[in-house]
Amino acid sequence: MESELYECDVLIIGSGGAGCRAAIEVSEHKLTPIIVSKGLSFKSGCTGMAEGGYNAAFACVDPEDSPDVHFEDTMRGGGFINDPRLVRILVDEAPDRLRDLEEYGALFDRQESGLLDQRPFGGQTYRRTCYHGDRTGHEMITALKEEVIRRDIETIDEVMITSLLVEDGSVLGAMGVSIMNSEPVAFRASSTILASGGAGHIYPVTSNTMQKGGDGFAIAWKAGADLIDMEQVQFHPTGMVYPESRRGVLVTEAVRGEGGILLNSEGERFMGRYDPRGELATRDVVARAIYTEIMEGRGTENGGVYLDVSHLPDEVIEEKLETMLLQFLDVGVDIRSEPMEVAPTAHHFMGGVRIDEWGRTNLKNLFAAGEVSGGVHGANRLGGNALADTQVFGRRAGISAAKNAMSSSRRHVRSLIEEEEQRIKDMVRDGSIRPAEIRDELHEAMWSDVAIVRSRRSLESAMSRISTLMDKLGDLDVPETGGFNSNLLEALELENMLITASLVTRSALIREESRGSHYREDFPETRPEWKRSILLNRKMEPQFIGR
């Protein structure tokens, strides 16, 4: 069947914070954007799940804070392989982008004086995290949604983008599949913005929504985009461990920011042994500390450690950690009097599509913003910087894509659409392997070999297993069902997950040191000669970018 074809000035893939902010900016330029989302618009991304806050150096609580200090903290936290140009833009523009959010209707907690309140997060010299209780992301995405609706921006739900339409190094739009009926859907656009988020679901334990399997990384790489820092995967130190159905669900850093303490099964407050900053060390340090406690036998019976706020006044918990209180009450734990059990969970990809200061990639007409892009956060993201990233670079990508669309004409794409239609059609066939079997094998390989602690042995093992799983894709059982076809969608997702996993593993094998979230037990030291980013091109050939 011939694809349904949509046309627009700017196609935006993803309806989270970065995608919405980009769409608003395109609309501001009097052009026509379309937002396409793999799930329900505004609900399937990770922005709405971000609980802790938004970093901006307003200096409302600590007058000594400034964008310069924010810059230094971010570079230090990222192991100094962040792109300093992007970091400078982030810290300088984050305050104005928060003011934009307030204009859209977002509310942030304030002090009695009326000034914004700011809480401490890991790796900060001064308190700079603006927040709305422990549901900041939800407040942000609600305001952004209302602004998108007010501007009458078209949103298309439940379409999985399967490829970018590329000719002679130029992106002319994208191709996808309707999740509802498995029919092909095509988009022709003068500019395309990737804002599709990360890939937490290449791991079995993650804080991400179900849609985050690396689609954006994979389709960008297949199209010829350069990716950087793909070895840098952040494991948030505190995800739920019990019950099994909630394993990996985020326990916000705001819990530690408000004074929560980490205890092992022996009742020891252990973080002081690992870092003088204690519970507010950077996430990579805290995650490895918790991992070590568990591996050395000081974990809880459910495979975690304790996070305790019972010493805090009830009113602090009820007002500033309300979501956490309700989240744990739902599983029978009252955090006002009982500790939480937590363990690391795959959370954020610092690496991604390489961008410049305006979200441009190495492919003409393709832009990227948010978690799918790389360079802002380096080897480790500071809590509170991600939400700021979505707004700062979502806006910039929107401006850049709009200007590009004004000077570009839409080109004929029918032959490119037909090629992708045929590729998807050919995936429907009889085979001997269910997609879920390969996904489970991938999860096991990534969790055991490419997670918090890595080595040459583990990474080479993972590369071999991923290659074997790639070979099995040709024998997937994807029967024709008519209408909704879960096996087809799983098969399409699996290819993207395997590509993303191979990018992560390949890059991790190349970096022979430990830096930020990338820890090699065979190279445990940070080495000065590795103060550089690893770039992988379409041929998986590494290039190095000195920082």
Swiss-Prot record:
SUPFAM superfamilies: FAD/NAD(P)-binding domain, Succinate dehydrogenase/fumarate reductase flavoprotein C-terminal domain, Succinate dehydrogenase/fumarate reductase flavoprotein, catalytic domain. One of its GO terms (biological process) is fumarate metabolic process. Coiled coil: none annotated. Keywords: Cytoplasm, Flavoprotein, Oxidoreductase. It is an enzyme of class 1 (oxidoreductase). InterPro entries: FAD-dep_OxRdtase_2_FAD-bd, FAD/NAD-bd_sf, Fum_R/Succ_DH_flav-like_C_sf, Fum_Rdtase/Succ_DH_flav-like_C, SdhA/FrdA/AprA, Succ_DH/fumarate_Rdtase_cat_sf. The keyword Transferase does not apply. It catalyses: coenzyme B + coenzyme M + fumarate = coenzyme M-coenzyme B heterodisulfide + succinate. One of its GO terms (cellular component) is cytoplasm. Optimum temperature is 75 degrees Celsius. Its main location: cytoplasm. Its EC number is 1.3.4.1. Its cofactor is an oxidized flavin. Optimum pH is7.0. Binds 1 flavin covalently per subunit. It comes from the Archaea. It is found in: Cytoplasm. Subunit A of the heterodimeric fumarate reductase of methanogenic Archaea, composed of subunits A (TfrA) and B (TfrB). Belongs to the FAD-dependent oxidoreductase 2 family. This is Fumarate reductase (CoM/CoB) subunit A. It comes from Methanothermobacter marburgensis (strain ATCC BAA-927 / DSM 2133 / JCM 14651 / NBRC 100331 / OCM 82 / Marburg).
